[in-house]
Amino acid sequence: SRIAIEVCKSNPEIIYARMVRNDTAFCNGGQQISGLYKSMDGGDNWQQVITDYNNSGLPCDVLGGFGWYFGRIGVNPNNPNDIFLLGVDLYRSLDGGISWVRATPDWWTYEVHADKHEIEFFENGDILLGTDGGLYKLRKNSTEWEDLENIATTQFYRVAYNPNNPSYFYGGAQDNGTSTGNAQNINNWEAIYGGDGFLPA
């Protein structure tokens, strides 16, 4: 089991804790979320926020069985009732965890990469989201995430090139598919496959 704890920066008396359980008979098996708790007095007393997943909007398998891998809760310092649960997808609650909505498109659309791990809030209302596939930005009062590309962080497992055009490469990366492009124009590479790229040829 695993516990994720997040303290509200603007009011340290407000703390959220997310519990994970490993139970093959619970919610499709694997390590799934088993409870979300909230304290209003700095951790002296706790109240379970979600008691009925069927009516909360938050699926019990939101972590995809990977509770050991996902652990982050995000609490907006400008509004402690505005919280995010990071997993394969991203869910958001505006009422302190009672009801939830999906905050990003389905992971398999690749509009926002799967596997969300980090979230950061800014005073102007903007939000940054860190994923296995890079960094995304949500501007204040917007619902569209912006992919902050051209950050040179992708690590390829293996690279292949076109022998008829030696400056044209293919690179395979874990969780970030296969990308292709010209060595002289690195800003215009494109992703041609999703998932794990590994060994392009």
Which positions does each model-derived feature cover?
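Beta-propeller blade termini and top-face loops
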Residues: 1-201
